[in-house]
Amino acid sequence: TNDSAQPWSKEEKLKWICPVPGYDRHFAITEQFGFELVTVPMEEDGPDVEAVEKLVADPAVKGMWVVPMFANPTGAVISEDKARRLARMQAGAPDFRIVWDNAYAVHTLTEDFPEILPILDIAEEEGNPNRFWAMSSTSKITFAGAGVGFFGTSEDNLEWYLEHAGIRGIGPNKINQLAHHEFFGSAEGVRAVMRRHAALIKPKFEAVLRILDKRLGEYEVAQWTNPKGGYFISLDVVDGTANRVWELARDAGILLTQAGSAFPYGQDDNDRNIRLAPTLPPQEEVEAAMDGVATC
């Protein structure tokens, strides 16, 4: 980064903080680039900041993933207090960065849109303006992999980034940018589209929650999240059984996300977590599948 004494590739040891359960593609990226992935628990209001504060004292820790709103897979929304603590904390590495991936910023399942924290302003106020790389896109709004991406950070970081981005390519697809602008028209236009998204997928989430509660609620053999937005439900089963539940479901013709996939290296030490993704299948398939999962 622009605050680094040398490229990270020349460092002897590199570490990256990963809140868990979290997003497997995030973990795959940092693993591919040679980082040792260290985990912290994801709580209802964001990552366990006390655990983060201890880890970042190590100068080998160069960064951290954060999905601040409707996090994958728990649906957690970070509190302003935790955001400020992440911005304020002392890091052993002067070039420590937080990738603030706001992929689900407007992906509500209700009529309400939570406030989007002004994380760059918070970073400035807390004395670490270069700490955050804020990102988002319309991949889960318009076209998967072919929407419009966003990158926000400090002016110093942007200057450094543009020096490198200018080598990679002349510029983004401005026709696609214009098409998105014309389609949405305004921020309220985005919210209107996302309310329509919610109308399509909310019944599927309700079905999952209803079946889990009906089939498993009284037995205390599982816990699950009740997200207000995002695309996933996080299911925790009895410790040591998640892979077996996944296998039984597979044998019954139900394809779930691999148990442990929400953890770095696919290793859930407690073997308890399964990420449920009900958005794609038709309603009747979601209900049939969840009835089968509850049986497993």
Listing of model-derived features with the role each one plays in the protein:
Residues D121-K202:
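Conserved core segment of the aminotransferase class I/II
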Residues G152, S234-D236, A277-T279:
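Short hydrophobic/aromatic beta-strand micro-patches
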Residues V238-T241, P281-Q283:
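Helix N-cap motif at beta-to-alpha junctions
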Residues T1-P94, A105-G127, A294:
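Conserved core of the PLP fold type I
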Residues G63, R97, W133:
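Hydrophobic "anchor" residues on beta-strands that sit immediately upstream
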Residues N128, D251-A252, Y265-C296:
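PLP-dependent enzyme catalytic core of the Aspartate aminotransferase-like
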Residues N102:
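Walker B catalytic acidic pair
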Residues R195-L209, V221-D236, R250:
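Conserved glycine-rich beta-strand-loop-beta hairpin in the small C-terminal domain of fold type I
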